[in-house]
Amino acid sequence: MFLTILAGLIAFAVTALAMPHFIRLYQLKKIGGQQMHEDVKQHLAKAGTPTMGGTVFLLVATSLSFVFALVYFRDGQSLGLISGILLIVLIYGIIGFLDDFLKIFKQVNEGLTAKQKFTFQIVGGLVFYVIHVMPSGIDAINVFGYHWHLGFLYLCFVLFWVVGFSNAVNLTDGIDGLASVSVVISLLAYGVIAYAQGQFDVLLLIGIMVGALLAFFLFNHKPAKIFMGDVGSLALGAMLAAISIALRQEWTLLVIGIVYVLETSSVMLQVTYFKYTKKKYGEGRRIFRMTPFHHHLELGGLSGKAAKWSEWKVDAFLWALGLVASLIVLAILYL
């Protein structure tokens, strides 16, 4: 536990020191920052804000994790597990980096095409499966102690889980501080589970990433000086999915990650209902004022009759939701 705290503090310090230099470099090079194409008017002032901050906390977290792992976890099983998680984080980080790079430096509005991004994400999931899942012989989903053996279909589940949650966290990263703190809450919940299981290798990775993310939040809270970009959000979502699989607690991510599930579900429901009503009535209708769900809250709260919610209020509501959901999972598992 001391090792995890020490590593987390080092990650916090290094990220906190490096981030201002990254922001300054961004500004000195006059790189075009975040573009805003949204209907939420209060977001227009954010146009040009530096992005790709995930590059910094990912490099810090993965580098420290590799160093600490090589020094303190020399057995093959732990190194294989740590390598599997870190590789999927790096691969998804690279995917996000390419996406951000094309948008910002090459002025390609959509970045990677949906097909390109999905293909790369599948490859990342396969790498994790080959490095961690196959050697462990795992082929079952653990749900409340019951193991559902899927055989080869477990590969499909792993790919669905990793790709799905990487994109879900990406959708969540839409207002200042929301994704970074939401992921910290989720990681802390998995830190408790890892500690209870004696999985100190996973706990180390969690502690380092939590430290790096807390330092990033110093620059990402409203008004944000920098955004994490796809490089950060895609990697963090993949990390959460990989950790839930590594700890054999896959189902918990549906609850611990309730914020990401809600954000993604709102988009899927909105698109489906809009297409259905357009076909049936000749005009598309909406369930939510705007999606993902955090924009729905910004434009009128839960009821729609309230005044527009500030970003801080939306953040506080969704952070609290994630925290309560995480505590419920821990209560189910250990009380």
Swiss-Prot record:
Gene Ontology terms: biological process: cell division; cell wall organization; peptidoglycan biosynthetic process; regulation of cell shape
Main location: membrane
Pathway participation: Cell wall biogenesis; peptidoglycan biosynthesis
Reactions catalysed, as given in the entry: UDP-N-acetyl-alpha-D-muramoyl-L-alanyl-gamma-D-glutamyl-L-lysyl-D-alanyl-D-alanine + di-trans,octa-cis-undecaprenyl phosphate = Mur2Ac(oyl-L-Ala-gamma-D-Glu-L-Lys-D-Ala-D-Ala)-di-trans,octa-cis-undecaprenyl diphosphate + UMP
Cofactor section: Mg(2+)
Membrane topology classification: Multi-pass membrane protein
Membrane-crossing segments per the record: 3-23, 53-73, 78-98, 118-138, 143-163, 174-194, 200-220, 226-246, 251-271, 314-334
UniProt cross-references to InterPro entries, sorted A to Z: Glycosyl_transferase_4 (IPR000715), PNAcMuramoyl-5peptid_Trfase (IPR003524), PNAcMuramoyl-5peptid_Trfase_CS (IPR018480)
Enzyme Commission designation: 2.7.8.13
Known role: Catalyzes the initial step of the lipid cycle reactions in the biosynthesis of the cell wall peptidoglycan: transfers peptidoglycan precursor phospho-MurNAc-pentapeptide from UDP-MurNAc-pentapeptide onto the lipid carrier undecaprenyl phosphate, yielding undecaprenyl-pyrophosphoryl-MurNAc-pentapeptide, known as lipid I.
Recorded family membership: Belongs to the glycosyltransferase 4 family. MraY subfamily.
Designated name of the protein: Phospho-N-acetylmuramoyl-pentapeptide-transferase
